[in-house]
């Protein structure tokens, strides 16, 4: 990060008892809070050997965050010291009270005594230590103050101490009305475990340079790794505005403001803050100090590059391309190969919407490896794998490519990209219909949630990769009928990624989709229809597809067909093959319901060709089952059984519970249809086998509470029991069928004319 620009003008004003000592080139201010820290350090030196080793260790661990963090109320500071050493907390309070209630000369004498800490052959504090540097900064800042500023500091210290006394008086009154132990426990938890409250930060006055840098680095790290622990967007922006009010040339504050605006998708504010960041970076001369005149060009080209990245993030690809052209021009003039490689990567993102840019990606990966840019090379490999997956490349080749990128990750300790790689493997296995492998990859990533601890003490477990994996995990559980487990995962997602966080849209979409599937299974089409609007807001293609499914279920065939045709054309244009195949299967079902069975066959063959071309095994298996159902309707059940044995295994191994139930129902239908030419004994055996398959289908369908399909299975099973003369079993199935039939609306179509 660039160094902070210091004010070059004298400002005698003082806010909240804070003296602006940086007018003399000092990078720190003297505040009442820092006076309290100085008293703590003084008393710590006096205590010496009286403190045991455990207390001293606790105090040493406490000092660094106290020195680096923002100012805090005296009550909060006192609570923190009491946790480590109660006796020392009392000494600090008494010493501070003597200074605050004494005369001005007492404060003068206190600072004179601090200088003695460095005297002698074996001083109490070394000048180059963390505490020594802090003491020297404070002594120097205090010595540079005028008499009026010293007096203002003294009155501010009195007010600081008085506010603590008032708060203690209020707390004592409250404790008379409440349980003492409960209140103490509550105060310790609230005061010490949680970050500073907004009102405490806002009243602490301007931060020193080191405090500001610590605050910015902490918040930036939290935004990247654990957004829930960072300040809210409004609170953080308020704090940043306060920082910029006292130092408008603080470049890093502008950059954090840019990141904060991205959280709420504010295009104008994020662009404004990004431009201000690079303006201030050039004004401070930080780049030019180390790189000469080249520093200015470096800032300009990276400013254009970051602006292009911002436009890509919001989908403004034309503006992004213009910014990239500017960055490329300046980078070529300066012969900056690193910047050019970053430009090439973003050029791929901006142009992949127009044409296949795999050539650009391959070139970018090769160049990045040549110039020793493992992070960029790995990202390129992962983008290339994603494009190849959508293009239908074999899974083994994609996994080999990801294995090569994983070698780069582990070699260079790129833990963030390791998470992304595992999340990508999960998504690829889901795309290819291998739910078992996807589940294994998801569990692998979840077990690595403590891979790297960042400096603020949080784990890198709130990134986009974890959000993606948890969403897939929730959907996998829902597909297997474990809705309670899926709800728990979604609940955890909501806690980890609140609605205002940048990755919240992921779980919102999956939550809506799971609710939609449950409503459709339960026959509550009006509820499913109400969920379509929410899905459409998050993903227009998914929303349009589910709207067509609802229309089809409500027997609005014409409207559903029009919508599916419109969606089919759009998905073919954007090359969304997965949705194209799903749409073709839905169109074929519309033809079945309309008794146009021969017209459905070419549609299904087209879907089968697509699914095999793009290696979508699960969709291919589902398409074969639909083709088998078409042949059953056309009167060739013997051939259907041969096809089913080929297609049913992938479905039973990796399919959703609903699809397993429908597949077993189809097997039973084919077994019954093929008994026409059987002898009486062989026919009875075939019907018994069909009943067993229907029982298995019932078990699957009951798991997902699919009442419509369950009703059809019960009807079919009752007919078979009637044929076999099993009256008691027939009556039981008939009773269950009647209960479901009264609850659900009838389609008005023959039972045999629906596969799912």
UniProtKB/Swiss-Prot annotation:
InterPro entries: Apc5, Apc5_dom, Apc5_N, TPR-like_helical_dom_sf. Belongs to the APC5 family. GO terms for biological process: anaphase-promoting complex-dependent catabolic process; cell division; positive regulation of mitotic metaphase/anaphase transition; protein branched polyubiquitination; protein K11-linked ubiquitination; protein K48-linked ubiquitination. Pathway: Protein modification; protein ubiquitination. Component of the anaphase promoting complex/cyclosome (APC/C), a cell cycle-regulated E3 ubiquitin ligase that controls progression through mitosis and the G1 phase of the cell cycle. The APC/C complex acts by mediating ubiquitination and subsequent degradation of target proteins: it mainly mediates the formation of 'Lys-11'-linked polyubiquitin chains and, to a lower extent, the formation of 'Lys-48'- and 'Lys-63'-linked polyubiquitin chains. The APC/C complex catalyzes assembly of branched 'Lys-11'-/'Lys-48'-linked branched ubiquitin chains on target proteins. The APC/C is composed of at least 12 subunits. Keywords: Cell cycle, Cell division, Cytoplasm, Cytoskeleton, Mitosis, Nucleus, Phosphoprotein, Repeat, TPR repeat, Ubl conjugation pathway. CDD domains: Apc5_N. Pfam families: ANAPC5, Apc5_N. The lineage of its organism: Eukaryota, Metazoa, Chordata, Craniata, Vertebrata. It is found in: Nucleus; Cytoplasm, Cytoskeleton, Spindle. This is Anaphase-promoting complex subunit 5. GO terms for cellular component: anaphase-promoting complex; cytoplasm; nucleus; spindle. The keyword Repeat applies. TPR repeats lie at residues 301-334, 522-555, 581-614, 678-711.
């Amino acid at each position: 990060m660039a160094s902070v620009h210091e004010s070059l003008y004298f400002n005698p004003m003082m806010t909240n008892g804070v003296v602006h000592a940086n007018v003399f080139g000092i990078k720190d201010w003297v505040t009442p809070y820092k006076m309290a820290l100085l008293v703590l350090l003084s008393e710590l030196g006096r205590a010496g050997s009286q403190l045991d080793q455990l207390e001293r260790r606790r105090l040493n661990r406490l000092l660094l965050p106290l020195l680096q963090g923002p100012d805090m109320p005296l009550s909060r500071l006192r609570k923190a010291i009491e946790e480590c050493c109660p006796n020392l907390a009392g000494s600090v309070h008494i010493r501070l009270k003597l200074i605050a209630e004494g005369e001005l000369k007492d404060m003068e004498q206190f600072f004179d005594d601090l200088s003695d800490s460095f005297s002698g052959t074996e001083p109490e504090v070394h000048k180059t230590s963390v505490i020594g540097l802090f003491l020297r900064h404070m002594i120097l800042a205090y010595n540079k103050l005028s008499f009026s500023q010293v007096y203002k500091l003294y009155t501010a210290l009195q007010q600081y101490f008085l506010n603590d006394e008032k708060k203690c008086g209020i707390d004592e009154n409250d404790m008379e009305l409440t349980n003492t132990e409960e209140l103490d426990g509550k105060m310790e938890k609230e005061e010490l475990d949680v970050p500073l409250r907004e009102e405490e930060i806002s009243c602490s006055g301007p931060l020193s340079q080191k405090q500001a840098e610590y605050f910015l680095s902490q918040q930036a790290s939290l935004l990247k790794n654990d957004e829930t622990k960072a300040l809210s967007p409004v609170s953080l922006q308020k704090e940043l505005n306060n920082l910029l009010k006292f130092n408008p040339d603080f470049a890093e504050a502008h950059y954090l403001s840019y990141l904060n605006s991205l959280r709420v998708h504010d295009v104008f504010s994020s662009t404004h803050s990004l431009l201000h960041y690079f303006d201030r970076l050039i004004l401070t001369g930080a780049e030019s100090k180390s790189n000469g005149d080249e520093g200015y060009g470096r800032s300009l080209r990276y400013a254009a590059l970051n602006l292009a990245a911002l436009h890509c993030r919001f989908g403004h690809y034309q503006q992004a391309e213009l910014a990239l052209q500017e960055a490329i021009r300046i980078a070529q003039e300066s012969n900056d190969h690193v910047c050019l490689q970053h430009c090439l990567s973003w050029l791929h993102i901006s142009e992949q919407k127009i044409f296949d840019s795999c050539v650009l990606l391959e070139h970018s990966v090769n160049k990045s490896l040549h110039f020793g840019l493992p992070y960029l090379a790995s990202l390129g490999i992962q983008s290339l794998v994603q494009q190849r997956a959508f293009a239908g490349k074999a899974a083994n080749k994609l996994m080999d490519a990801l294995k090569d990128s994983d070698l780069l990750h582990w070699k260079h300790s790129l833990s963030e990209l390791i998470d992304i790689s595992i999340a990508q493997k999960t998504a690829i296995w889901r795309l290819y219909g291998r739910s078992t492998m996807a589940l294994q990859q998801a569990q692998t990533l979840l077990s690595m949630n403590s891979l790297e601890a960042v400096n603020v003490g949080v784990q890198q477990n709130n990134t986009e990769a974890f959000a993606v994996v948890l969403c897939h995990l929730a959907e996998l559980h829902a597909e297997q009928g474990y809705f309670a487990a899926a709800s728990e995962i979604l609940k955890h997602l909501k806690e980890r990624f609140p609605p205002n966080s940048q990755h919240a849209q992921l779980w919102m979409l999956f939550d809506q989709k799971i609710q939609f599937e449950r409503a459709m299974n339960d026959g509550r089409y009006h509820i499913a229809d109400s969920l379509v609007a929410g899905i459409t807001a998050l993903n227009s293609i998914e929303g349009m597809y589910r709207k067509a499914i609802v229309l089809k279920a409500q027997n609005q065939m014409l409207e559903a067909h029009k919508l599916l045709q419109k969606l089919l054309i759009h998905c073919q244009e954007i090359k969304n093959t997965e949705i194209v195949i799903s749409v073709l299967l839905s169109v074929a079902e519309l033809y079945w319901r309309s008794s146009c069975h021969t017209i459905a066959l070419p549609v299904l063959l087209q879907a089968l060709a697509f699914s095999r071309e793009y290696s979508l095994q699960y969709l291919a298996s589902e398409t074969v089952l639909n083709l088998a159902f078409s042949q059953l309707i056309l009167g060739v059940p013997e051939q259907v059984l041969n096809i089913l044995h080929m297609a049913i295994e992938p479905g039973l191994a990796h399919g959703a519970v609903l699809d397993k139930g429908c597949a077993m129902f189809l097997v039973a239908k084919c077994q019954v249809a093929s008994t026409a030419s059987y002898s009486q004994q062989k026919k009875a055996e075939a019907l018994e086998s069909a009943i067993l398959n229907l029982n298995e289908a019932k078990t699957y369908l009951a798991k997902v509470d699919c009442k419509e399909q369950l009703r059809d299975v019960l009807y079919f099973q009752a007919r078979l029991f009637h044929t076999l003369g099993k009256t008691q079993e027939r009556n039981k199935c008939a009773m269950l069928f009647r209960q479901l039939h009264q609850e659900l609306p009838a389609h008005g179509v023959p039972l045999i004319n629906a596969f799912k």
